[in-house]
Amino acid sequence: MSFQSLGRDDLLAQHELQQRNYAELQAKQLKLDLTRGKPSPEQLDLSNGLLSLPGDGADAYRDGHGTDTRNYGGVQGLPELRAIFAELLGLPVENLIAGNNASLEMMHDSVVFSLLHGGLDSPRPWSAEPTVKFLCPAPGYDRHFAITESFGIENVPVPIREDGPDVDVIEQLVASDPTIKGIWCVPVYSNPTGATYSTDVIRRLVQMPTAAKDFRLMWDNAYAVHTLTDEFVEPVDVLGLAAAAGNPNRPLVFASTSKITFAGAGVSFLGASADNIAWYLKHAGKKSIGPDKVNQLRHLRFFGDADGVRRQMQRHRELIAPKFALVAEILEDRLGESKIASWTDPKGGYFVSLDVWPGTAKRTVALAKDAGIAVTEAGSAFPYRKDPEDKNIRIAPTFPSLPDVRDAIDGLATCALLAATEALLGDK
């Protein structure tokens, strides 16, 4: 029964039903949170073995090369840990840096270094340009957009599809506008849509002519191994493809263990051409003599090898896949027949992207808040928090317990239905 096909009387009856459902929802006095994609306590417990590593034996603090990880130095990170993640990311180990906890910090630093000093191929520092723009596939990751926005860089939204961003649009924009210096990308299980970039899209992104010679792909491979199935996405060597296309310096690849081990005490990674690695370390070396190598050694011993990481991710999958399945089940049961919403069914990552009736996302989120269900601000997945259709809501089901996920999604569905009937009645 599509709500849009209902006459006014039937629609009014539905509206009254949803008002009653909403009153019952408020009476429950819930206090639930779907706002951020955080690992649950049970997921964090999977990595408690790190807390007893690297151990206290005579040489427990030395890596396989004999390096004393307690001391200064080693700006590129431990080679053995880099080798594990080079395999997982499909990159040469010599083109990978292992850093401290936050890959977001490496992204931030890369933008700051470009603003202050210019990147390789830059005619001048970005801060000396009258205008700097960044392309933002949307819906996308709000913290990416926040970095560029905070420095006065103009965020330009571009559509994203199931196989990645709309390259037809991107190619036209970058070919003629030298102020466009880069694009934010989440190539595997994109936040929040779950899209995985096709090889064709990746090839076009590294090959396309750009008016800015220093154009950068900010390649945040945050969910490279974060599958919700028993299969992993085959890594694509974006650095190799870019080099073959004559644009070796275009990609800056980022990743971390934040949603693999401890979100607040992991290891970050930056992959790039040899020249870009030297550029980054030259500037990063002014603020640090080296990363936390003891923590890197912990992770090396905890994982052992790339298969150890894959086994860890399957343990994560066992905990969170039922939550994603429950979200899909409830949304279909509550919203499917009414045809007032659509949503993604991701194969990996941390989010479900819900599109409610156009013009009602803010109202839906406000209703949810008043019923004790915290949801990410409507529009947050778009540059400047401006969703042109006011329809997108990001759902983060990993942190709450399974019963809380059930209550939160069921309640959110009630709010979406009520908001839709309000909007449709206003049109009739």
Curated annotation (Swiss-Prot):
Keywords: Aminotransferase, Isopeptide bond, Pyridoxal phosphate, Transferase, Ubl conjugation. Belongs to the class-I pyridoxal-phosphate-dependent aminotransferase family. It comes from the Bacteria. One of its GO terms (molecular function) is L-aspartate:2-oxoglutarate aminotransferase activity. PANTHER family: AMINOTRANSFERASE, PUTATIVE-RELATED, ASPARTATE AMINOTRANSFERASE. Pfam families: Asp_aminotransf. This is Putative aminotransferase MSMEG_6286/MSMEI_6121. Its cofactor is pyridoxal 5'-phosphate. There is a cross-link at residue 339 (Isoglutamyl lysine isopeptide (Lys-Gln) (interchain with Q-Cter in protein Pup)). The keyword Transferase applies. Substrate binds at residue 37. Pyridoxal 5'-phosphate binds at residues 72, 102-105, 191, 222-225, 256-258. Disulfide bonds: none annotated. It comes from Mycolicibacterium smegmatis (strain ATCC 700084 / mc(2)155). The keyword Isomerase does not apply.
